[in-house]
Amino acid sequence: MIPAVLLAYFWYSVWQAGHENDRRRQEAHDSLLRQARAAADRTVGALDESAAGGNGGADVLTGVIWEHTGTPVISYDEERRVFTAVGLRSAEYTEEMQLFGGGPDMVQRCFVSSYVRRPGAGWTSTVTERDIEACGGSRWIESSVRFVRKAMEGWEADDQWTRAGLQRVLDPVGQADDDRRFVVRSVVRRGENVVAVVLVRDTGLGGGSGSEGAVVEQCYRLQRVLGSPGGVVEPVTAVPVVVC
């Protein structure tokens, strides 16, 4: 009798822990959805302010969206006048101990946010959750931009800050055009500021959405400040842009 009671209690504990973990996982997911919607609401307010101030260029508005969402891929459909931001969000939670483990875990969700301004009205947003695979390219772009920033921070150009020079730094092998992860569009130095515009691409080699046949790409404007006091290299800033 006792073994049967113990066995029943054991399986009840397993069921209860599983039920609690499902609840915590769903709670983490719901928090991500709330975060995505809150970010979209903040962005709409910022877009309205930018438009009211006369700053309505596509690159400016892209920067506003990026500032309030941190989304690595932001596209603009000029015909429909719609900005679309694709990005991954993640949240940690703690699972109850079970037969096969427990402890810290993470949920990830892919969100697509669209921003449109109708004639005579303000900006509006729509947030949609997509399959995690839809954010593969966005995740790859985000990782690649970090690489470009680090490469620019370590770039010693001996005052020859050129497009070809940065292209060699980012692509020393010289890949074929279709396979290039990075295409340097321009490098301009004004005083101690070096500004580069780089097209960052997921061609599918990184396992992102490009592996399904579509190339995901995003232009970024990167800036490095030279000659910092004490020889300290200032972090390179990177902001997505539409015009490349």
Q: Residue spans of the language-model regions?
A:
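Hydrophobic membrane-insertion alpha-helices, especially the h-region
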Residues: M1-S13
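Extracytoplasmic low-complexity, Pro/Thr/Ser/Ala/Gly-rich segments
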Residues: W15-S90, M97, E133-V188, V239-C244
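A short, structured loop/turn motif at beta-sheet edges
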Residues: E78-V82, S114-G122, V187-E192, R224-S228
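Residue-level signal for mature regions of secreted extracellular proteins and peptides
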Residues: R80, G103, T128, E212, ...
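Short, cysteine-centered beta-strand-loop-beta hairpins and adjacent loop/turn segments enriched
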Residues: S90-V107, R201-V216
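Contiguous hydrophobic, core-forming segments of folded domains
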Residues: P104-S143
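Extracytoplasmic
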Residues: Q108-C110, G191-N193, E217
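Extracellularly exposed regions in secreted/surface proteins, prominently low-complexity, repeat-rich
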Residues: L199-C244
